[in-house]
Regions:
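Intrinsically disordered terminal extensions that flank WD40 beta-propeller domains
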Residues: 1-68
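Short loop/turn segments that connect beta-strands within beta-propeller blades
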Residues: 96-98, 138-141, 180-182, 222-225, ...
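WD40-repeat beta-propellers
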Residues: 91-94, 115, 133-136, 157, ...
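Loop/turn segments within WD40 beta-propeller blades
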Residues: 73-79, 116-121, 158-163, 200-206, ...
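Conserved strand-to-loop turn within each blade of WD40 beta-propeller repeats
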Residues: 85-88, 127-130, 169-172, 210-214, ...
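WD40/WD-repeat beta-propeller blade-loop signature
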Residues: 58, 68, 78, 101, ...
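WD40/WD-repeat beta-propeller blade N-cap
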Residues: 62-69, 106-112, 148-154, 190-196, ...
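Blade-level signature of beta-propeller repeat domains, shared across WD40, Kelch, NHL, RCC1
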Residues: 368-397
Length: 397
């Protein structure tokens, strides 16, 4: 993974049963266009440079880094524990509301590009552009393992939903999987023709999906490393994939691309099932995500738009217009979705109405990553301005 541009930013033995997909190619699609909601008027001129202390909305600001931040992750079990990483070759563990405590994740020799907590919160993985992954014991605050293998920078990290199995995508076109308790490589997934930019386990842990700059989605058997499906060509993306999300039933993959397209793939069959109905963006897609209910999803792009989609019917529910490109998003619950933007602002949107219900100030440069605390009371943003901000979002579920 190249450092983000300053402008654009245990396997179980259950039988291999396949869940039915609740939509298919024969669904009748009626597409309509919903007028986008204008943002509330900016106060004191939106073009002026942000000055700290002027209408800031954060309840905590972490300033321990000395370079741009690229990644943030909140613990799934500790409601105050946060990890951040960036271009200063360092990561930090710190706590919301405890400004005098921080633990430095030392030892990386290049930018810390990705962070991820294990499902139980006991482990934290940090990946770097030097191709090294470090696994940290969170309770003891020490490095438990160093994982090696990839020949290029780490693009992303994901944990198995029920074990200390770690998956990583690399710039060297490969995907690696380790047992982090022993540091043993379990499998290497080879087949992509370019950097592997996104990927994840399905929530049931049975399948791996990966997307690449080669414009393909690959669906893998994690035990055998067999490539079950390769999704490419018409009607799929024509340029590299940038982001990926999988629904809670492990049946659908939502992907975004540099070409401005968003597609839905049936994981079981490997078929594109959206009939090109999700075609509203005009620039690179930077982020996608399913709502907790799976019936809705969101996509954000450099065309300054957040699109809300009705996944059951392939219909646009709303267009949320921004002042600059949308770099990241996070669902706060069934109704509200947060966006991070190139203009340094974090916005909350009501997905039912398309209205911007809150704009958070606190950053002076582009937002690169968002994460929600375990109790969903806090939203944490990481920015190119070298800081992370914490915002209260408990009233938006």
């Amino acid at each position: 993974m190249n450092a983000p541009d300053p402008v654009v930013p245990p396997l179980h033995d259950d039988e291999d049963d396949n869940n039915d997909v609740f939509l298919d190619d024969h669904d009748i699609i009626h597409e309509y266009v919903m007028d986008g909601e204008d943002l509330p008027d900016a106060e004191d001129g939106s073009e002026s440079e942000h000055e700290e202390g002027d209408d800031d909305d954060f309840v905590h600001k972490f300033t321990g880094h000395t370079g741009e931040l690229y990644s943030v992750a909140c613990s799934p079990t500790d409601t105050t524990l946060v990890a951040t990483g960036g271009s200063d070759d360092r990561g930090f563990l710190w706590k919301i509301g405890e400004g005098d405590w921080a633990f430095e994740l030392q030892g990386h020799e290049e930018s810390v590009s990705s962070l991820a907590f294990s499902y139980d919160g006991h482990r934290l993985a940090s990946g770097s552009l030097d191709g090294i992954i470090k696994v940290w014991d969170v309770s003891a605050n020490w490095e438990a393992r160093q994982l090696e293998g990839p020949g290029g920078g780490i693009e992303w990290l994901r944990w198995h939903p029920r074990g200390h199995i770690l998956l990583a995508g690399s710039e060297d076109f490969t995907v690696w999987m380790w047992n982090t308790d022993s540091a043993i490589v379990l499998n290497t997934f080879v087949g992509h023709g370019s950097s592997v930019t996104c990927g994840d386990f399905t929530p049931d842990g049975k399948i791996i999906c990966t997307g690449s700059d080669d414009a393909t989605l690959r669906i893998w058997n994690p035990r055998s490393a067999e490539n079950i499906h390769v999704v490419r060509g018409h009607p799929y993306h024509t340029e590299g994939l940038t982001c990926l999300a999988i629904n809670s039933t492990s049946t659908l993959a939502l992907t975004g691309s540099k070409d401005g397209s968003v597609h839905i793939v049936n994981i079981t069959t490997g078929r594109v099932v959206d009939n090109n109905a999700l075609a509203s963006h005009t620039d690179s897609i930077e982020c996608v995500g399913f709502a907790p209910s799976d019936s809705w999803a969101a996509s954000g792009g450099m065309d300054k738009k957040l699109m809300i989609w009705d996944i059951e019917h392939f219909l646009p529910r709303g267009t949320c217009e921004h002042e600059e490109g949308v770099t990241c998003l996070a669902w706060l619950g069934a109704s509200y979705v947060a966006t991070g933007c190139v203009d340094g602002k974090v916005r909350l949107w009501d997905s039912r109405s398309g209205e911007c219900v809150k704009t958070f100030n606190g950053h002076s440069d582009a937002i690169q990553s968002l994460s929600v605390s375990a109790n969903r009371d806090y939203l944490v943003s990481a920015s190119l301005d070298e800081t992370a901000c914490v915002f209260e979002v408990g009233n938006f579920r």
